[in-house]
Curated annotation (Swiss-Prot):
Protein modification: Differentially phosphorylated throughout the cell cycle, becoming phosphorylated at the G1-S transition and dephosphorylated in late mitosis. Mainly phosphorylated at Ser-23 and Ser-29, by cyclin A-CDK2 and cyclin B-CDK1, respectively during DNA replication and mitosis. Dephosphorylation may require the serine/threonine-protein phosphatase 4. Phosphorylation at Ser-23 and Ser-29 is a prerequisite for further phosphorylation. Becomes hyperphosphorylated on additional residues including Ser-4, Ser-8, Thr-21 and Ser-33 in response to DNA damage. DNA damage-induced 'Lys-63'-linked polyubiquitination by PRPF19 mediates ATRIP recruitment to the RPA complex at sites of DNA damage and activation of ATR. Ubiquitinated by RFWD3 at stalled replication forks in response to DNA damage: ubiquitination by RFWD3 does not lead to degradation by the proteasome and promotes removal of the RPA complex from stalled replication forks, promoting homologous recombination.
Entry protein name: Replication protein A 32 kDa subunit
Source organism (scientific name): Mus musculus
GO biological process: base-excision repair; DNA replication; double-strand break repair via homologous recombination; mismatch repair; mitotic G1 DNA damage checkpoint signaling; nucleotide-excision repair; protein localization to chromosome; regulation of DNA damage checkpoint
Annotated segments matching region Interaction with RAD52, TIPIN, UNG and XPA: 187-270
Length: 270
């Protein structure tokens, strides 16, 4: 799945004693040569994050941090709300439901006719890897990889990766052999940290239900969205899962059938 595109952050990054190891200048235990260096080498590992955490990151001496964790290359998972293509780049607005949508810019190779330059359509869930940037106090990502999700379990897996990576990176280096960090770390619930509560969609729906609801909301036709059209836009999703989500949304009053039992419209539509 995702790891076929590039090397992601994983537990295999850690040494046998449980400590985090990497090249000089990163998160490894300080050595005399590192301490003497005035210039820093930017962290090279990829850290899974949420948009809310990226927006709360602090920038000091050209280094982004979330709490005590230094970040540069990150991954996020979310749904594309808007996509706009220019001659040299594509700008996406990506929403993971933890904060307002974030701008993600992907530069395109004008001499490359392959599918790498194709625009991923709105209402598609994707995983993005890129570099965090800040311009005029507005944070954004410069993406070097954008991959549509093939399995919605990847969304859940990303959440677990976020929590795990932050726990390991924020673990005191002096306790590298002391075993796993406690899950009851009080810092985990502080603003900007990797609290599990940040990952719950505000409307209480699952990822699948949200994706179905968003597609129905986005349909401008008076009769609403046809179920066959819904299926064609969610080809990566099993049909029973789509039907189950539609039934749930109907029963909970989020959508309703219109001209027949196969056309649906959002109750929030004007």
């Amino acid at each position: 799945m995702w790891n076929s595109g590039f090397e992601s952050f994983s537990s295999s990054t850690y040494g046998g004693a449980g400590g985090y190891t990497q090249s000089p200048g990163g998160f490894g235990s300080p050595t005399p040569s590192q301490a003497e260096k005035k210039s820093r080498v930017r962290a090279q590992h990829i850290v899974p994050c949420t948009i809310s955490q990226l927006l709360s990151a602090t920038l000091t001496d050209e280094v982004f941090r979330i709490g005590d964790v230094e970040i540069s290359q990150v991954t996020i998972v979310g749904i594309i709300r808007h996509a706009e293509k220019a001659p040299t780049n594509i700008v996406y607005k990506i929403d993971d439901m933890t904060a307002p949508p974030m701008d993600v810019r992907q530069w395109v190779d004008t001499d490359d006719a392959s599918g790498e330059n194709a625009v991923v359509p709105p209402e598609t869930y994707v995983k993005v890897a890129g570099h965090l940037r800040s311009f005029q106090n507005k944070k954004s990502l410069v993406a070097f990889k954008i991959i549509p999700l093939e399995d919605m379990n990847e969304f859940t897996a990303h959440i677990l990766e976020v929590v795990n990576s932050h726990m390991m990176l924020s673990k005191p280096n002096s306790q590298a052999s002391a075993g796993r960090p406690s899950m009851s770390n009080p810092g985990m619930s502080e603003p900007g940290n990797f609290s599990g509560n940040n990952f719950m969609p505000a409307n209480g729906l699952t990822v699948v239900q949200n994706q179905v609801l968003n597609l129905i909301k986005a349909c401008p036709r008076p009769e609403g969205l046809n179920f066959q059209d819904l299926r064609s836009q969610l080809q990566h999703m099993p049909v029973p899962s789509i039907k189950q989500a539609v039934d749930f949304l109907c029963n909970e009053g989020h959508i309703y059938s219109t001209v027949d039992d196969d056309h649906f419209k959002s109750t929030d539509a004007e």
